[in-house]
A protein has these predicted regions:
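Proteins synthesized as precursors that undergo proteolytic processing into mature forms
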Residues: 1-117, 158-160, 167-171
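In a subset of proteins, long, contiguous C-terminal domains/tails are tracked
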Residues: 102, 106-171
């Protein structure tokens, strides 16, 4: 039996009107807002990125991708760039876009300045080398581990050699 408890603010993901795909009904599962992104070029990965942030994940990730592709930003610049968000009501702007507030208000938008939109984005660019980036919105940091990809004979448990496994299988 369910408890009736909805985690975080996920009730906003449901439609309050009956008879629709996301209408509130007993036993309905909470939709999620996960959006790990891969950007491909010629079927090869160019960028991978993701972040926490509920409903603000999708537009935040897309803004970073637009910044990378259309505005030629570096990976670090793209994940740290100021963000904008709306769900049809007021427009939220991070402080870095505060200069846009009067223009948006002149167009009839209600604008709210906020310290951050979405969570701390992390990203990787793939090329001759891999480059990582983490933004200021969270305590994330870039960490790289060397050693190359796993090869035949490489095991997670150093005390168990491949020969031990073969002997056990044959025994």
């Amino acid at each position: 039996l369910g408890t009736g408890i909805i985690p975080n603010n996920y009730m906003s993901n449901f439609d309050p009107h009956a008879g629709r795909a996301l209408s509130v009904v007993p036993g309905k599962r909470v939709p999620t807002s996960m959006a790990p992104m891969l950007v491909l070029q010629d079927e090869k990965p160019v960028y991978a990125l993701g972040l926490p942030g509920g409903l603000r994940i999708f537009p935040s990730a897309l803004q970073a991708i637009v910044n990378l592709i259309d505005h030629d930003m570096t990976l670090q610049q793209a994940v740290e760039a100021p963000r904008i968000w709306t769900q049809g009501q007021e427009v939220e702007l991070e402080d870095g876009l505060a200069a846009q507030k009067p223009g948006l208000e002149a167009l009839g938008h209600q604008v709210k300045l906020v310290p951050h939109i979405g969570g701390g984005m992390n990203a990787i660019s793939f090329g001759e080398t891999m480059t990582g980036a983490a933004c200021w919105r969270a305590d994330g940091t870039v960490l790289a581990l060397g050693g190359g990809l796993a090869r035949p004979g490489v095991r997670f448990w150093p005390d168990k050699a491949p020969e031990d496994e073969e002997d056990a299988a044959a025994g």
